[in-house]
């Protein structure tokens, strides 16, 4: 199947549901025969961006590197799913401009919901002062102004969130089958 490459960039707070949506979308795309790659922020940090810290400069460099790899894959017709907090609007826009075929998905859940979902205990540690510069606690998260898709994971099911992304990819001509929301 001939497909157009695109980077689907899922951004949001830790615990908002980025990885969950990415995994479900990945399974659906593979089942439909699409060539895809996933760049998960946690995995990228232990490999591609090892050694970077959590200063604004290091976070921006982390996103630039993810964007660079995404751009290479996208140019070769791959659907790239990026799941990364990517807290700063300016660097997300920079990466969007370089990649071109880019769909921003704002995975939106209130901080209180993300803290309730805190399976890794990161928010608890950040509130206790054990983790500094934690996004949403003592470092800002800048929501996108105009994402192509917004998934309110506190108000909708996983299936509804996946359908929103799927339908947007269909509408933009990256995939060829819509799913009812």
UniProtKB/Swiss-Prot annotation:
Which Pfam family would be a valid example here? APS_kinase
- Name this polypeptide is given: Adenylyl-sulfate kinase
UniProt superkingdom? Bacteria
Question: Which top-level enzyme class is recorded in the Swiss-Prot or TrEMBL entry?
Answer: transferase
Q: Which EC number(s) does the record attach to this protein?
A: 2.7.1.25
Keywords in alphabetical order: ATP-binding, Kinase, Nucleotide-binding, Phosphoprotein, Transferase
Where does the record place the catalytic residues? 86
Q: Which InterPro entries match?
A: APS_kinase (IPR002891), P-loop_NTPase (IPR027417), Sulf_AdTrans/APS_kinase (IPR050512)
Source organism of this protein record? Microcystis aeruginosa (strain NIES-843 / IAM M-2473)
- Kindly list the biological process annotations in GO that this record carries: hydrogen sulfide biosynthetic process; sulfate assimilation via adenylyl sulfate reduction; sulfate assimilation, phosphoadenylyl sulfate reduction by phosphoadenylyl-sulfate reductase (thioredoxin)
For this chain, one GO molecular function annotation is: sulfate adenylyltransferase (ATP) activity
Recorded hits in PANTHER family, A to Z, give: SULFATE ADENYLYLTRANSFERASE (PTHR42700:SF1)
Q: Name one GO cellular component term.
A: cytoplasm
Q: What does this protein do?
A: Catalyzes the synthesis of activated sulfate.
User: What does the entry list as the binding residues for ATP?
Assistant: 12-19
Q: TM spans, by residue? A: none
Which positions are tagged coiled coil?
none
